[in-house]
């Protein structure tokens, strides 16, 4: 066994990933029937619909005072995001830090940056583009417009969000 970091949005814990904005909206739009019929592809279908909608303006304020604005934010407590995709190059689920990618622009930029990240081994602080990569212990997200949230692939309400480090969780791992 080992202990991994556990973070929470408004007191709701998550282990691996979270998202606010387009990612959260994609999960919100994904129905149980879609998941049964299309499996993981259901999220792609819902994501295409979410990207046709107006994206909220999000403001992430970290515990060390950084303020970042964007249209969508994904959080990773480990390198992987949504299965085998390695999107957070610097993430480590035992370091006490939550990694975040703040997308500055809406849909086309998010898609382009995500595809480039997959090719380049994930997002990291040394690569520049239409996003900012930050590492934090706690923070908050405010929104102008509807900003759905997801935690580990489940819809978890809407912003505003208070992000906290909820402690450690013992897991069985190889």
Language-model segments: which ranges?
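Gly/Ser/Thr-rich active-site loops/lids in small-molecule metabolic enzymes
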Residues: 34-41, 89-110
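Hydrophobic residues embedded in beta-strands of well-ordered beta-sheets
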Residues: 13, 98, 169-170
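Short acidic/glycine-rich loop or secondary-structure boundary segments that cap or lie
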Residues: 23-26, 68-69, 81-84, 108-111
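A short catalytic or substrate-binding loop motif that flags glycine-/basic-rich loops and adjacent residues
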Residues: 50-54, 94, 133
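ATP/nucleoside-binding phosphotransfer catalytic cores, i.e., glycine-rich phosphate-binding loops
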Residues: 62-67, 92, 102-174
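Catalytic core of DAGKc-family lipid kinases
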Residues: 1-71
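Glycine-rich phosphate/pyrophosphate-binding beta-alpha loops
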Residues: 19, 23, 74-88, 155
């Amino acid at each position: 066994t080992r202990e991994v970091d556990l973070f929470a949005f408004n007191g709701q814990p998550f282990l691996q990933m979270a998202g606010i904005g387009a990612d959260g909206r994609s999960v919100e739009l994904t129905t149980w029937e879609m998941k049964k019929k299309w499996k993981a592809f259901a999220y792609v279908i819902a994501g295409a619909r979410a990207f046709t909608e107006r994206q909220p303006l999000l403001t992430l304020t970290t515990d060390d005072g950084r303020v970042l604005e964007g249209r969508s934010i994904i959080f990773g407590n480990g390198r992987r995001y949504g299965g085998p995709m390695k999107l957070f190059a610097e993430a480590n689920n035992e370091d006490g830090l939550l990694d975040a990618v703040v997308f500055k622009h809406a849909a086309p930029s998010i898609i382009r940056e995500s595809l480039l990240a997959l090719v380049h081994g994930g997002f990291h602080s040394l690569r520049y583009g239409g996003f900012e990569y930050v590492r934090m212990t706690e923070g908050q997200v405010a929104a102008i417009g509807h900003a759905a949230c997801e935690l580990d692939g489940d819809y978890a309400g809407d912003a505003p969000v208070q992000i906290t480090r909820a402690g450690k969780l013992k897991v069985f791992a190889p």
